């Protein structure tokens, strides 16, 4: 038996399980990790040892190990944490595992120590498992051991470091703002925190550091950033969580081009450190150009299927739905061409009406141009030969195409077809190569909230109107544009920002247009208005959704896959049981009782 040496009591490990290669053959190593798999081949026992960096195969041979090492190997079970000492040796071509970065070597183990035992895990700790997400979230501490999840957390850490360094190198100052602040609702509900010392009064967890970073600009910070935790009590979707992280940025004594150029430098630097090239200067697309062409204010421009305006073609149509829209001010007739979907069965096409309804449609008009040259459609009988000819030409119709229509108010029609465009791209498995970056700029300043019967801010109530539209705000608020810019990545809103109102009178006018009385405005935002009176400089900023960007960089389906401890779609933490009841004594401490 080869000579063994005691494990160095001053070092838990000398190498990680992901770094050993052929050039390390002959090296003595100490490794720690979890038993991933164990295989008993009679006289030899093989074990895959896993840590956060990877997996290394261990070999236990009674002729090359002390007696305890082989005995321990016989008893080891999955997820036991162990510590071993051994010598790196080559596996040989016949037994090389090309799926592992360490697949050319193994460690001939001469000493082993069990650091703890484990009960049987509820699922296999490996990638590609068929386990429900609820189970994974309930045992999140086990799910995080999987290589895929650990790689996601590593990428998140690396990207956060990269953007911090990019900002620091450009003289941005990292400043922390309070997590307990005043309730100033910004579109979603606040999470509120009762004060024990001041009964009946409440703090709120910030939906964003928006007002505080503006105050930092008034205070002279000039270039600020923060990796900020934000809280919003809203309905959840695949890309939403009640608490999320954004890289928050603000600058003063700047105009919109200054801010966007600085952001492009920072983002290109950070993405470049991750091996992702972001070309600069970024394309800039006007909001209405994005809506009219892609049906989305966050378009994925890696594929076509553009929205096409057919309003003029159907102005005199016998199909009343189209004719009415074509002759009504503010309404349109538009379509998209899903090439290849024209071969779908009628039943499959009919189901698309249900999809369209989720985007606000009352139905879906369509024409399927079959491969054999025939046409299948419930509406084509109403079209004249001239209308069909014009439609074919403008939509670039070929056999196998499926043309889908929307008719009605411009924005709603754009949104319906934009939703269908995205759905069809997924259904047809249209390839989207690489990453897609652009700015969408100049959003409307307001939209009409039908439920409240009032104007609402499109972004937030502190956004500066475009200079040319300031005069028209009171006469025609919906026609006013804003100094805004959204950073779009792969068809997702990855970040957003804008220039801020830095004049107290203009800010009060904006709040009044949004339905605030002077008293309410003073109650909620008096501290901001007061600060703006003390020579507030021109300012603008941005917030990058860290969770969402990491989701896109890892190719994950949900931001939950790039967060250590996310909530479910209902806002629950299945691991801890939060939210949970609190004791009567705790409620009494803050002068509350349950109704």
Where are these regions (language model features)?
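Class II aminoacyl-tRNA synthetase catalytic cores and aaRS-like
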Residues: 1-595
